[in-house]
A protein has these predicted regions:
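Basic nucleic-acid-binding interfaces
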Residues: 1-116
């Protein structure tokens, strides 16, 4: 869905993937559900659209919509940094993410859209 700011129309979606430190398969059960809630909170706070969350035992897939003012690396920084901080403050077990991540764009632009 096309959204708008004062000066721009946009449809920006990012597929973001990252893993826990040492790729430990620990993102299951209560941890998985807690992280889903935390990612939703972060997206609400930062005016992002959380389209889809898929948490596997050893990695996280997020599909996030964002206004054009936010560069992809900033989104990853928010999602990894804030989620680890919130999780570690609220629960006894600890979450640490690796420094690496994957981010790709997703969306569709037709010839008609370019011509307009």
């Amino acid at each position: 869905m096309v959204k708008s700011t004062r000066h721009a129309k946009y449809e920006l979606y990012y597929h973001i993937v990252f893993i826990p430190k040492y790729r430990e398969p620990r993102l299951m059960g209560a941890t998985k559900e807690r992280l889903k809630t935390i990612f939703a909170e972060i997206c609400d706070d930062k005016d992002l659209e959380l389209v889809e969350v898929e948490i596997m035992p050893d990695h996280v897939h997020l599909f996030v919509g964002s206004p054009p003012r936010n560069e992809p690396s900033l989104l990853v920084n928010w999602l990894k940094g804030i989620s680890a901080r919130y999780y570690n403050q609220r629960y006894d077990d600890r979450i640490k993410w690796t420094r690496s991540y994957y981010v790709g764009t997703a969306g569709s632009v037709s010839k008609d859209t370019v011509e307009q």
